[in-house]
């Protein structure tokens, strides 16, 4: 199956016209498409099915529990399937079955280990300062983000380790990155990187392909393990005004 991958388009702040990639059988949107949600209309009538995981900015200035069903309904009206802690099996043109396992996978701030967690959470003022989201009326701060992240992690681990519908390949889709290897090279191992990447390296062997967004840099690497190799790909556009979109490929396709 040939997948087109886009993320971090930030259509609420910069113009960008997405186009279908030649030969793609499916479009994957890995979050932060448009904080206003208006940009999802760009994908109405897309020539192939569209799967999406939400990004953190899809919740800017919103109440988390109210936003989830509203976003799912909005995406559905645009012909987009929003997935959150859901698995879905699709078949490609050759009849091969591909299982998609998807969640936003918020940051749990354990990227650098439990001893550095408090420092990483203090550095995560970003979530309150920029998002200004709420959860049950309270600020969606670092502690609340971690709570959601742990629930995502538990679900993801269960989905990848328990028998499910048989499939020829498994693709994980998250917004937050699964490894420090996907960290933005501009920031390296700063504490703030734990707001963008998780230490999900132990889950990588359970997938054939892992697609993510969130970091405004591109990544395409393989991780070798006893089961073989897992490919990790991020095709984040980022903000052109900051020079982040220079190597972004608007028609990138990934074969699985």
Predicted regions, residues:
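Beta-strand-turn-beta hairpins that frame and shape the catalytic cleft
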Residues: 1-4, 88-102, 121, 169, ...
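Short amphipathic alpha-helices and their capping/turn segments at secondary-structure boundaries
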Residues: 44, 82, 88-97, 154-166
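Binuclear metal-dependent phosphoesterase catalytic core
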Residues: 73, 77-78, 94, 184, ...
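A basic- and aromatic-enriched beta-loop-alpha substructure that forms the phosphate/nucleotide-
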Residues: 51-58, 63-123
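Active-site-proximal loop/helix segment associated with metal-binding centers of metalloenzymes
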Residues: 101-171, 176-187
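Active-site neighborhood of phospho(di)ester-bond hydrolases with catalytic His/Asp-centered motifs
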Residues: 5-7, 27-32, 51-56, 81-86, ...
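N-terminal active-site segment of His-dependent metallophosphoesterases
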Residues: 1-52, 59-67, 132
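Active-site environment of divalent metal-dependent phosphoester hydrolases
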Residues: 10-15, 34-39, 57-67, 89-93, ...
């Amino acid at each position: 199956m040939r997948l087109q991958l886009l993320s971090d388009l930030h259509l609420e702040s910069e113009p960008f016209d997405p186009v279908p990639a030649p030969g793609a059988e499916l479009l994957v949107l890995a979050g932060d498409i448009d904080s206003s949600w208006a940009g999802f209309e760009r994908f109405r009538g897309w020539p192939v099915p569209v799967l999406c995981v939400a990004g953190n900015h899809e919740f800017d200035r919103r109440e988390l529990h109210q936003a989830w069903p509203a976003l799912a309904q909005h995406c559905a009206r645009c012909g987009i399937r929003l997935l959150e802690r859901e698995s879905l099996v699709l078949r490609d043109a050759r009849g091969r079955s591909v299982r998609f396992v998807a969640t936003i996978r918020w940051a749990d701030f354990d990227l650098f280990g439990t001893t550095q967690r408090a420092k990483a959470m203090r550095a995560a003022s970003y979530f309150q300062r920029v998002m200004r989201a709420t959860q049950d009326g309270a600020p969606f701060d670092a502690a609340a983000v971690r709570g959601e992240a742990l629930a995502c992690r538990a679900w993801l681990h269960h989905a990848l380790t328990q028998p499910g519908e048989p499939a020829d390949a498994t693709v994980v889709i998250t917004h937050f990155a699964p490894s420090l290897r996907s960290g933005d090279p501009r920031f390296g191992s700063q504490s703030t990187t734990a707001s963008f990447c998780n230490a999900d390296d132990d889950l990588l062997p359970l997938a054939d392909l892992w697609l993510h967004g969130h970091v405004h840099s591109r990544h395409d690497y393989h991780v070798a393990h006893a089961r073989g190799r897992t490919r990790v790909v991020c095709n984040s556009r980022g903000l052109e005004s900051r020079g982040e979109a220079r190597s972004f490929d608007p028609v990138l396709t990934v074969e699985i």
